[in-house]
């Protein structure tokens, strides 16, 4: 059996790299009063930036504090620039694997730049917690944070190539799952939550997961007819169709929007907090509502952008034409391309609406009625966990099928 198709080996590699990433979260940065930092964690300037995807993690400034955030920010920048610069768009859609490798290299260089900026922004806020504040401390801590971010990116790459799933998504998935497990144990054994409250909370999570799975797995069946079918008895069969996912973007729009929102929050709160305009805006529209609206706008924007990159209507139309496959009542070429574009727009609109609703609904209930629907767990985090879990299961099945096929051949 080929090593790349060995599911056990890939699972072992994935667990190995995840263990290294988790280990790095518990290695503290030297020269910092961790107790003071922990006690002031919820009020200090960098907590929101560090805990984008894992709100309940231990409030400790570790070597992996930045995590995968610089890489996500670099990905966001590349996605936005791709829509503005044809050269980048060409690398993504037309140049195949070579183009993807070039784009991946650019993303990594950009990740380093983001890691440097974010590390420096964090270090300059650590004067209160440093044992000895001087130039040596600033340089040393900045280099440690940058190195940690680059190492996490390397671990994510290794998970993608040697393990199962997309490395960045898997790391985010593990961090969120770990945070939720910690929260759940805390509620059960420390706060002694009532059984009825726990049962209601658990039932609500199960219902939410069911809704997420339903929408994530839902497809729009586009009927197709091949040239071979014209000469066979299966001409009128409904078994031949092209599946288009309703939520084509998956969890990526949520991941990108969450990361960008954390950056915006940091800039507004600690970069523009002295401006009178910020207080004026807050008087008109509370920041809580403003950020929820901004979050929804980011989700919709990234969903449309990501869907346009995942599914190229022109290429899909051309591939069907080359394979002598047509859609009933739709002419090949431009008409087929327009059909796919209109269909994808409708599906993306529904998918964006679903993503925005599932993020807004619990926050709206909490803000208006003061009911905490998902105590300790953001529904966007739940969406990421479920989405990544589905992808991991699908990829595992692919390796199992590949293994069975090899056994049949040999």
From Swiss-Prot:
Keywords: Chloroplast, Membrane, Plastid, Protein transport, Thylakoid, Translocation, Transmembrane, Transmembrane helix, Transport. It is a multi-pass membrane protein. One of its GO terms (cellular component) is chloroplast thylakoid membrane. The chain crosses the membrane at residues 61-81, 106-126, 135-155, 170-190, 195-215, 248-268, 289-309, 349-369, 373-393. GO terms for biological process: intracellular protein transmembrane transport; protein targeting. Induction: A monocistronic transcript. It is found in: Plastid, Chloroplast thylakoid membrane. Belongs to the SecY/SEC61-alpha family. Component of the plastid Sec protein translocase complex, which is composed of at least SecY and SecE. This is Protein translocase subunit SecY.
């Amino acid at each position: 059996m080929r090593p790349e198709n060995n599911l056990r080996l890939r699972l072992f590699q994935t667990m190995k790299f995840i263990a290294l990433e988790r280990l790095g979260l518990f290695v503290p940065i030297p020269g910092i009063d961790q107790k003071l930092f922990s006690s002031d964690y919820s009020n200090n300037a960098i907590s929101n930036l560090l805990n984008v995807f894992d709100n309940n993690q231990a409030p400790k400034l570790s070597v992996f504090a930045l995590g995968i955030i610089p890489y996500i920010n670099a990905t966001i920048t590349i996605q936005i620039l791709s829509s503005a610069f044809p050269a980048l768009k060409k690398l993504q859609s037309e140049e195949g694997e070579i183009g993807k490798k070039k784009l991946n290299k650019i993303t990594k260089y950009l990740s380093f730049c983001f890691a440097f900026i974010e590390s420096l922004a964090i270090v300059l806020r650590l004067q209160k917690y440093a044992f000895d504040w001087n130039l040596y401390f600033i340089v040393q801590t900045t280099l440690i944070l940058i190195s940690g971010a680059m190492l996490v990116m390397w671990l994510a790459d290794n998970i993608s190539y040697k393990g199962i799933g997309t490395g960045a998504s898997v790391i985010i998935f593990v961090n969120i799952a770990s945070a939720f497990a910690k929260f759940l144990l805390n509620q059960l054994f420390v706060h002694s939550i009532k059984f009825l409250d726990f049962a209601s909370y658990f039932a609500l999570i199960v219902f939410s997961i069911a809704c997420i799975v339903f929408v994530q797995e839902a497809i729009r069946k586009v009927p197709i007819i091949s040239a071979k079918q014209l000469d066979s008895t299966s001409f009128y069969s409904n078994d031949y169709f092209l599946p288009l996912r309703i939520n084509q973007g998956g969890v990526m729009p949520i991941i990108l929007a969450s990361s960008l929102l954390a950056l915006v929050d940091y800039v507004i709160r600690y970069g523009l907090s002295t401006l009178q305009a910020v207080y004026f805006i807050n008087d008109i529209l509370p920041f809580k509502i403003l950020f929820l609206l901004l979050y929804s706008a980011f989700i919709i924007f990234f969903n449309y952008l990501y869907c346009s990159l995942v599914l190229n209507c022109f290429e899909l139309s051309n591939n069907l034409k080359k394979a002598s496959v047509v859609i009933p009542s739709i002419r090949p070429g431009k008409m087929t391309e327009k059909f796919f574009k209109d269909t994808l727009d409708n599906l993306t609109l529904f998918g964006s609406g679903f993503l925005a609703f599932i993020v807004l609904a619990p926050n709206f209930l909490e803000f208006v009625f003061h009911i905490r629907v998902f105590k300790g767990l953001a529904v966007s985090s739940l969406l990421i966990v479920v989405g990544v879990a589905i992808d991991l299961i699908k990829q595992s099945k692919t390796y199992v099928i590949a293994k069975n096929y090899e056994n049949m051949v040999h």
